Amino acid sequence: MRIGHGYDVHKFGGEGPIIIGGVRIPYEQGLLAHSDGDVVLHAVTDAILGAVAMGDIGTLFPDTDPAYKGADSRVLLREAFSRVMAKGYRIGNLDVTIIAQAPKMLPHTPQMRVNIAEDLHCHVDDINVKATTTEKLGFVGRKEGIACEAVVLLIKESLS
């Protein structure tokens, strides 16, 4: 078994909507990023890569490479996870915490779970996505951006 932790943050800017967990969410602003700015999938990608000591999303998909400009983070997650599966690992469980003052995430978390489970080839019951605020404190509380943390347990498949 291997445990990984991922963290990502993006600043609000430009026009909405935003994409979080592969879900398009209406909002007055977008998230500034080289790719689509999906903080959930970026944190998840970092967690799975970190669990198997394969670096992070920025190493695998550098923001200096124009090929990833505006990239769909679901595509990036699938590519990263294919490398993790090639090492013989599968998802045990994944726990995601979105830290955002706005917009409200609860209506969207069920679809986020479905998207992530599909991308990671696991059951939706292995995926948890929840959201919290910072009680109006800090950059998140001032609605300047969104952050996300992810913790994953990977299980090595037996070669029987």
Curated annotation (Swiss-Prot):
Entry's cofactor comment: Binds 1 divalent metal cation per subunit.
E.C. no: 4.6.1.12
Annotated binding of a divalent metal cation, by residue: D8, H10, H42
Binding site for 4-CDP-2-C-methyl-D-erythritol 2-phosphate: 8-10, 34-35, 56-58, 61-65, 100-106, 132-135, 139, 142
GO molecular function: 2-C-methyl-D-erythritol 2,4-cyclodiphosphate synthase activity; metal ion binding
Cofactor: a divalent metal cation
A Pfam family this chain is assigned to: YgbB
Catalysed reactions, semicolon-separated: 4-CDP-2-C-methyl-D-erythritol 2-phosphate = 2-C-methyl-D-erythritol 2,4-cyclic diphosphate + CMP
Residues at the site labelled Transition state stabilizer: H34, T133
Key words, A-Z: Isoprene biosynthesis, Lyase, Metal-binding
Gene Ontology biological process terms in this record: isopentenyl diphosphate biosynthetic process, methylerythritol 4-phosphate pathway; terpenoid biosynthetic process
Biological or metabolic pathway of the protein: Isoprenoid biosynthesis; isopentenyl diphosphate biosynthesis via DXP pathway; isopentenyl diphosphate from 1-deoxy-D-xylulose 5-phosphate: step 4/6
Subunit structure: Homotrimer.
Primary role: Involved in the biosynthesis of isopentenyl diphosphate (IPP) and dimethylallyl diphosphate (DMAPP), two major building blocks of isoprenoid compounds. Catalyzes the conversion of 4-diphosphocytidyl-2-C-methyl-D-erythritol 2-phosphate (CDP-ME2P) to 2-C-methyl-D-erythritol 2,4-cyclodiphosphate (ME-CPP) with a corresponding release of cytidine 5-monophosphate (CMP).
Protein name (record): 2-C-methyl-D-erythritol 2,4-cyclodiphosphate synthase
Organism (species): Proteus mirabilis (strain HI4320)
